[in-house]
Amino acid sequence: MKRSFLLLTCIVTGCLCGCSKLEVQPSESDLVFNDLASVWDEAMPLGNASVGELVWQKGDNLRLSLDRIDLWDMRPIEAFKGEDYTFEWVKNQVRKGDYDPVVDKFEKKAYLAAPSKIPGAALEIDISSWGPVKENRLYLDNALCEVLWENGASMKTFVQADGDVGWMVFENVPESFDIQLVPPEYQVKGAEEAGLGSSSLALLGYPQGEVKREGNRVTYHQQGWKDYFYDVAVDWKRAGGKVIAVWSVTSSISGKKAASEVDKALAEGPKKAYKRHMGYWEPYWEGSSVNVPDATIQHQYDREMYKFGSATRKDSYPISLQSVWTADDGFLPPWKGDYHNDLNTQLSYWPAYIGNHLDEGLGYLNTLWNQVGKYKEFTKKFFGKEGLAAPGYCTLEGDAMSGWVQYGFSPTTSAWLGQHFYLHWKYSADNEFLKERAYPFLRDVALFLEQETEVKPDGTRTFEYSSSPEINDNRIDAFFPVITNYDLALTKFAFTAAAEMADSLGLVDDSARWKKDGGQLPYYAIDEDGGLSIAPGKSYDLSHRHFSHAMAIHPLGLLDIHNGPKEKTIIDATLERLHANGPDWWCGYSYSWLANMEARAAHGEEAAEALRTFAECFVLRNSFHANGDQTKSGKSQFTYRPFTLEGNFAYASGLQEMLLQSQSGVIEVFPAIPKDWKNVSFNRLRAMGAFIVSAELKDGKVVSLNVYSEKGGTLKILSPIDGTVITRQTRPGETVRII
């Protein structure tokens, strides 16, 4: 989508009247409807990684669901205390064949209402007299939602990109206009007797917060667990025939006060706020763009990149399952809105790299780095080892949460987290980051895995028990007595990446150590058809949502078609078996992941088909990934609709992989596009080595190919004309025109 931006041309007539116009730029990928959604998970999403808003209609009211990323109940899990809170105890129960105590401890006793992400509150405006909605549009370029009613009333709302506030500007609304602040119901009489289970907000045990009103100002204070609390405030004024409103959500963690944030915003006025808002979004969209001939794929891609910019920042907490769009239905969010490190957080950041949004990706890496101390404490306590292991399911602050122990407490989780440090280094060529963050993180992961694995008499390094998310669910046989391809690939990656980093830093002894450890690992388990098995003796002979057995192909890239016919055969056979076993028990994110793998295999048609299926079958009308097949057309037997974001962001990565790859050490443009895509272009996608690439395919021929070298160094790029590798030495800041 080609983007252009309009300058803000607001006329100031007093501070509050400075929003006479909030200029917007429509795009073909905007979300446009002639009504308001009637449920929260189909609402228009706005956010800035700190606070978020969902715009929809509940009954006769316009409803804005407000959220904040650090609204959390992080009470400790009592079941995770005691001498039996160790991996050795778990393994001993597996050895004895007595697994019920493990399920009892890590699931039944631990899966309570909290810890969990919690909702904020909602704002409601009575629109019963306003008549039908004429247009409801989310302007992606401007991160602004505009609603027009047939009677002439209108609202523009945006979540300020650089603050903890949201704005609403109404025109042509009645004198009776009012805003109500509606808090979540934390006190529901008879909740336990009603059988609401662990999903009811009432079971958190909070006192119902107090809503106070002084004129047009409404505030809400909610006490959470122990000393935690959060506040919501909204205030509005009439000015120049308009109603201008500001809301804020703050928490005791943030150290800010919602009412003060609202006061500061109103004093500044919407003109300046919107200018700063666009000061983020304009360069964000200029970071990269793609243009493909398939409108379905194009529109979904643009919507994913919009949500990515709304859900993460350099200094933000990472993207959780629902980010700043927590469920507004009176219940806890799906899977408690936590951080799932067995797939979800990792997939959510895939588009940061080729998509040229490394700063947005730093919100993830900075948080992981800041929690290293906590991970090391967990490693020592639970595994009894030095080094670094991280929980598979965790809270905002990195503490372990309940769940299936095979994946929530997997020893290789930290290796997958570590890959993101590796990717940031490779795509940024930032040697300071390598020295100060990336290598120390991977080094500690490798140190832990060196201890957690064992070397058998034949010299082979393995685990006593291994797993592969989420094969065999939470049963005892989900622990394999042989190393799975999932654990093998992650362990192999950790040692290989640590050795490469050590080499780059001139740490000869470290490099030799990690190479030795990696060299003791076996080769991948291969099935009778030549593809990757789940584990030795266990083929991928089922339909499963999590392609954990294929990690070596993508995202780890340990197996690559550029490495010769043997690896190409393994990759092709693995994908063939995935298709042969069918998608009965896939989720939406499975199709997104599949698109990335098909792209790595240079299967353009198959990659595009996976993306198209995701966009047509697994998203709600507002573009949210709903996990299940919403069309019930046989794309999955899962037809439910729990909203999670990882499928959305992995989708964006899938298209990026079709357009640009560099994992082999050689940059290749359009490596995996369908044959009928004759006119394709992209601008400023990022390759490894800190090379920024722009290219255009016209009538089936590459007519433009330019590479900007951020850091200098050796550029290797595959000529789209004759297939030879072009090698150039570049200077920092130099642009190389290939075609």
Model-derived regions, located:
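Acidic/histidine-rich catalytic neighborhood
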Residues: 444-501
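Active-site core of glycosidic bond-cleaving carbohydrate-active enzymes
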Residues: 341-377, 397-399, 409-431, 436-439, ...
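Catalytic cores of secreted or luminal carbohydrate-active enzymes
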Residues: 108-128, 642-688, 692
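Carbohydrate-binding surface patches
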Residues: 161-168, 689-714
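Bacterial Sec-dependent N-terminal signal peptides
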Residues: 1-24
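Carbohydrate-binding/catalytic loop surfaces
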Residues: 322-335, 384-404, 460-484, 531-544, ...
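Acidic/polar, glycine-enriched structural segments that form the non-catalytic walls/loops
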Residues: 20-41, 46-338, 357-362, 368-377, ...
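C-terminal beta-sandwich/jelly-roll accessory domains of carbohydrate-active enzymes
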Residues: 701-739
